[in-house]
């Protein structure tokens, strides 16, 4: 009887805690803050200063994405900074860890580890994805660190984009902005440094690193970074708050102001999950300029909640004057890019959703270059050709290579 009594009270306690966790996860972030325009003011101030000498290359395919990361790590002589949302112990994840182990061990820290007394903080994710070598070169974008995004370890892969930036490391450079941002995240009081004994897996990592060098020795040799990149007019980092808390949508506000600079906007995002404020912003943009969204069709997406929300909100989105390319290409689109006019390209981790705007840490890189903008617009053509274009006037057009896919439940 005593044992049953204890189990009963344990069940009640567990149920009460789960209810507490669910309710706080819903209601703590519910009051949504407003942007004050601070991030936009910082961005405008940077434009008034002399631009640093920085060069850029876009990284479009998974094999190149893994190889450039390995090359960047191999080139480091002093320091490597690595921040990622989703690192797995699969093929590409082990490749990265082997390369990092081969370069240096500089400490590992978890952003906002689990706090059982404040379970709502699980809502706030470190969604940044970047890798910096020696304070002079970095890769930043939307790719996570696993086989869905890197290498050729599995057949099914996501479509995504990174940019490689080579910098002079000057005071106003984007790499200095990124390092400052990293330090602000690294120093958050909630973070936890992981310590412990040397893992028994270090020998395996050393062997894997040796194998990587044997296979990719030529590619991992000294890289002519200038030849591999193109000069651009200006590069600047936009970042949200590093705190693990509900955030003012400063980054979204800055992106909207940026989009207002052009008359032809292509917004690439895996899904669209907005509140009225965000939809109103899109509507205001679409009133005086062409605004088109390139996103996954319901039958193409890998995010069930994103797809279901788009089904529910599709007519609302179209009524705002936005045209939507619904991609059906056999691979889930994970790209987060905004192409503005003929000279601005914005690439990073920010999805067009409330989580990116109000909860998670996010980074977007603003690149001023007609050459880069033209190249990224050309890259998008293959997905536009495989899309169904839902027009805001109620019409529908089909790309030259669009193929209808029947959903299994229809």
Name every feature range the model reports, one short phrase each.
Residues 2-128, 133-410:
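Charged, low-complexity intrinsically disordered terminal segments
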């Amino acid at each position: 009887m005593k044992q049953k009594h204890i189990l009963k009270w344990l069940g009640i306690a567990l149920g009460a805690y789960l209810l507490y966790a669910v309710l706080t996860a819903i209601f703590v972030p519910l009051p949504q803050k407003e942007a004050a325009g601070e991030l936009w003011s910082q961005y405008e101030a940077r434009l008034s200063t002399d631009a640093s000498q920085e060069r850029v290359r876009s990284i479009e395919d998974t094999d190149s994405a893994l190889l450039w990361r390995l090359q960047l790590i191999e080139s480091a002589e002093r320091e490597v900074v690595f921040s990622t949302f989703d690192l797995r112990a699969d093929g590409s994840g082990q490749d990265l860890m082997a390369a990092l182990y081969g370069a240096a061990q500089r400490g590992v820290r978890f952003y906002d580890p689990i706090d059982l007394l404040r379970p709502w903080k699980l809502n706030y994710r470190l969604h940044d994805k970047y890798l910096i070598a020696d304070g002079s070169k970095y890769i930043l974008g939307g790719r996570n660190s696993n086989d869905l995004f890197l290498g050729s370890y599995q057949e099914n892969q996501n479509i995504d984009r990174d940019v490689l930036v080579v910098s002079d490391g000057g005071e106003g450079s984007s790499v200095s902005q990124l390092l400052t941002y990293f330090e602000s995240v690294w120093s958050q009081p909630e973070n936890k440094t992981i310590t412990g004994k040397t893992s028994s897996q270090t020998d395996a990592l050393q062997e894997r690193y040796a194998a990587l060098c044997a296979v990719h020795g030529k590619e991992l040799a000294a890289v002519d970074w200038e030849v591999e990149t193109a000069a651009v007019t200006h590069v600047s980092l936009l970042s949200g708050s590093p705190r693990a808390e509900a955030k003012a949508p400063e980054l979204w506000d800055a992106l909207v102001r940026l989009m207002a600079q052009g008359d032809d906007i292509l917004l690439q995002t895996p899904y669209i999950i907005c509140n009225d404020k965000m939809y109103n912003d899109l509507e205001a943009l679409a009133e005086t300029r062409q605004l088109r969204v390139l996103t996954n069709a319901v039958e193409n997406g890998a995010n069930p909640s994103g797809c279901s929300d788009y089904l529910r909100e599709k007519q609302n989105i179209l009524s705002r004057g936005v045209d939507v390319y619904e991609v059906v290409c056999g691979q889930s689109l994970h790209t987060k890019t905004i192409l503005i006019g003929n000279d601005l390209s914005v690439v990073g981790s920010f999805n067009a959703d409330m989580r990116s705007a109000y909860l998670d840490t996010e980074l977007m890189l603003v690149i001023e270059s007609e050459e880069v903008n033209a190249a990224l617009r050309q890259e998008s053509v293959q997905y536009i050709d495989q899309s169904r274009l839902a027009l805001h006037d109620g019409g529908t057009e089909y790309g030259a290579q669009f193929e209808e896919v029947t959903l299994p439940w229809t």
